[in-house]
Each structure stands twice: as C-alpha cells, then as structure tokens.
C-alpha cells in the first residue's frame, strides 16, 4: 500500500496525458454535430430529421469501429493505429470546413467514426503509466481535453457572434485539423521515449490476447455491469444534444448565448469536473462515486420536466443543462477507471474498452433519428418524450451500479472470474 501512495506523475507522463488530451479534443471534429448542433444545422442548411439521420448513421459506423478497433489495438501497436487515425482526422477536418451539406456530411462523419482512436489511445496511456495512477491519469486526460477544447469553443463563440454559423464552423474545423497535426507529432515522441519498465512484461500463452480469452471477457458479469452501467449514464448525451435547440426555441435564448453555454458545458466543465471525479473515485472508490453522477443525471431531467417551458424560467433550464453536463463529465473518466477497478486483464484491456464503447454507442444508432423525428412531429411534446425515456435509462444505470457494488464487495471481479474459468478448464 505504501508503494502505491508514493507513485507520482513524471514529466513524461504529464506530457503523454496532455498530448492525448489534445488528440481527444482534435477528434471533437466528429462531435461538432452533437456539441454544436444548432450552428452546424444552420451552416449546412439541414433539418432536424436530416441531423438525426446523420447522427444515427455515424453511430452505426462507430459501433463497427469500436468492435474491430479494440481488437486490433491489442494486436497492433497503438502508435501505428494512432498515426493513421490522426492523419485521417486532419484531412477530414479540412474537408468538413467547407460546410459540404447533407450527403457529404454523412460520408465525412462516417469516415470519422470508422477510424479507431479511443481504444489505442487508452492502451497507449495504460502502457506508459502505472495502474495505481489510472484515476488521476484519466481525470487529467479529460481536463486537458477540456482546456484545449475551451480554446476552440471560445473562438467559435466569437465567430458565431461576429460572422455567423457558416464561418464559425469553418474556424472550428481548421483548429481541429491543426490539433490533429500537433498530436500526430506528439504521439511519435511518446512512443519513442516510452520507458521499457512501463511496458507490459512478457506474457505466457494464457496471458496473451486470444479469441478464447476474449470469449471469457464477454461472459464476465463484472464487465457487462461496467459496460451497461456506463452506457446508461452515457445516454445523457442524447438529452443534452437536444437541450440546446430547446433553449433557443422555448426559453428565448439567442444563438450566441447557447453557443457560449455549449462551450461552458463541453469545455469549461470538462476541465474542472474530471479532476474532482478522479479525486472522488480515489477517495471512496470508483463504483461508489458513480452514484453521484447518476444522481446528477436524474436531478437534471426532473428539473427540465417539471419547470414551465417559458423564457421566465430560462435560468432553471440552464442549470439543468449544466447539471446534466456535469454528470456526463464526471462519468467520463470512470469509464476507464471502472475497468481498472474490476481488474480487467491487461491483454484484453483495449478489447474491453472497445466493447464498452460499442455497447455505449448502440443507443445512438437509432435514438437520434427517433428523437429528431419526434421533435419534428410533436414539437414540445417530442422533447418531453426524450426526457421521459431518459429517466428510465438512468434508473437502469443505478440498478447496474448497485449490482456491481455488491459483487465487488464479495470479491467477484474480473480476475476472480478468469481464475474460476481457468480452474474449470
């Protein structure tokens, strides 16, 4: 225990976390359509139905990418995958800066989604930093991503207020392209300077990646409870996506004000909340800390459902947005920390991250299309349908976390499960 407490972040580790955070921000180009829904829709002259279709098709592509991305990240070096991914992001961001319209948006966002990034990046960090620092590493990863994203968001807010949606989307995409280029260089330095002692030790045949071990992973209850619990918490992004147009349409906020709020929720909170989330998870445990963020999710949705949808109540609506965004930013570092907490085998770590990401994005494959059509058909009632479904989803997340909490107290983590399966074999 004393050795764990003495573990400290080195300059090299801080550099690795910052570069990966910058890269995470650069991949935000594929999230423009979610995080800056209003201005992207206007810049490309799209309808809510078309936006929903793009989001759904992109989500299907993401599910496919997460499936093969995690597996190849446990077979191919993270550096190789990340080099290809960042070069692709750089080129695609430049193309997206031309505001290409509906059909081209589908193609570009699908290409974004099909390019693996998250799983190899997490694997790179996992093999260059000690596991006892995982909470701190992933918390600061999100924070650095928020800091660099804040710069992008503020520049976009200025562009919206000064020049309108078309120019602001162009500015955003160019900045993402530049960040991709910088990260591409940084990844080469990290891979070159990584110390041998931080890399995994030589593994026996039973400890290497294999489809037999992968089959054990997908049968492990602890893994599924993490994957599903994180997925139900992640569904808050669906509600958060539609809160921005809701604020403009029903609460009387200007487009520039909503863009500024989007910047705060996407970037300012991303810089602050994950640091607290990592500290809180280290203090009381990752599983127990997740109750707080699921509670924020539920409180946010209850507020928005019970207040009158008029301009007089816009402050309550803004508070609801910030509360839900805080829930999502607090949940984010836990998605990886929980996998460490349940002692996921390192030879399957990227595969587990991939399965978690794949399960997490399955609702996106149909939810955005359904939500967009519901809003177009029912207006205000359509928005409320979205939030009512969100209540059911967050309750499901609480159930998963309660069961996981009980299993962890009984010592039934992934290492225990793999040992049991090994004895049976």
Can you name each region flagged by the protein language model?
Residues 33-35, 145, 149-153, 220-270, ...:
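Extracytoplasmic gate region of multi-pass secondary transporters
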Residues 74-85, 282-296:
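Cytoplasmic membrane-interface "Motif A"-like loop-to-helix N-cap segments
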Residues 285-335:
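C-terminal transmembrane helical hairpin of 12-TM major facilitator-type secondary transporters
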Residues 64-100:
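Conserved MFS/SLC helix-loop-helix module at the cytosolic interface between two early adjacent transmembrane helices
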Residues 135-160, 357-368:
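Glycine-rich segments within core transmembrane alpha-helices of 12-TM secondary carriers
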Residues 189-212, 411-422:
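Flexible cytoplasmic inter-helical loops of multi-pass small-molecule transporters
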Residues 108-144:
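Cytoplasmic helix-loop-helix junction between adjacent transmembrane helices
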Residues 343-379:
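A late C-terminal transmembrane helix in Major Facilitator Superfamily
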């Amino acid at each position: 225990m004393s050795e764990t407490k003495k573990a400290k972040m080195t300059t090299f580790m801080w550099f690795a976390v910052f570069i990966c955070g910058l890269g995470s921000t650069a991949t935000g180009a594929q999230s423009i359509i979610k995080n800056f829904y209003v201005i992207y829709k206007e810049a490309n002259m799209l309808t809510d139905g078309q936006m929903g279709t793009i989001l759904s098709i992109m989500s299907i592509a993401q599910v496919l990418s997460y499936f093969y991305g995690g597996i190849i990240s446990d077979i191919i070096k993270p550096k190789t995958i990340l080099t290809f991914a960042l070069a692709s992001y750089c080129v695609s961001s430049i193309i997206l800066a031309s505001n290409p319209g509906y059909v081209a948006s589908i193609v570009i966002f699908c290409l974004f989604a099909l390019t693996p990034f998250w799983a190899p990046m997490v694997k790179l960090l996992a093999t260059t930093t000690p596991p006892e620092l995982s909470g701190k590493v992933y918390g600061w990863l999100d924070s650095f991503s928020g800091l660099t994203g804040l710069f992008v968001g503020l520049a976009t807010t200025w562009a919206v207020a000064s020049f309108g949606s078309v120019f602001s989307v162009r500015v955003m995409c160019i900045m993402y392209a530049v960040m991709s280029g910088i990260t591409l260089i940084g990844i080469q330095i990290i891979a070159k300077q990584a110390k041998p002692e931080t890399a995994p030790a030589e593994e026996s045949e039973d400890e290497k990646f294999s489809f037999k071990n992968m089959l054990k992973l997908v049968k492990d209850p602890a893994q599924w409870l993490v994957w599903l619990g994180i997925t139900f918490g992640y569904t808050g992004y669906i509600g958060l996506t539609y809160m921005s147009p809701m604020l403009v349409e029903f609460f009387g906020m200007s487009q520039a004000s909503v863009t500024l709020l989007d910047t705060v929720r996407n970037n300012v909170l991303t810089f602050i909340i994950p640091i607290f989330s990592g500290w809180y998870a280290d203090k009381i445990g990752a599983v127990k800390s997740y109750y707080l963020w699921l509670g924020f999710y539920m409180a946010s949705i209850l507020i928005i459902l019970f207040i009158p949808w008029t301009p007089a109540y816009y402050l309550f609506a803004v508070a609801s947005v910030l509360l839900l965004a805080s829930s999502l930013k607090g949940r984010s570092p836990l998605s990886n920390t929980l996998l460490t907490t349940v002692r996921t085998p390192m030879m399957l770590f990227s595969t587990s991250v991939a399965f978690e990401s794949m399960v997490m994005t399955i609702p996106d494959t149909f939810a955005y299309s359904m939500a967009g059509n519901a809003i177009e058909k029912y207006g205000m009632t359509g928005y409320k349908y979205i939030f009512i479904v969100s209540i059911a989803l967050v309750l499901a997340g609480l159930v998963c976390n309660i069961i996981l909490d009980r299993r962890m107290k009984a010592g039934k983590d992934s290492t225990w499960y793999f040992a049991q399966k090994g004895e049976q074999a």
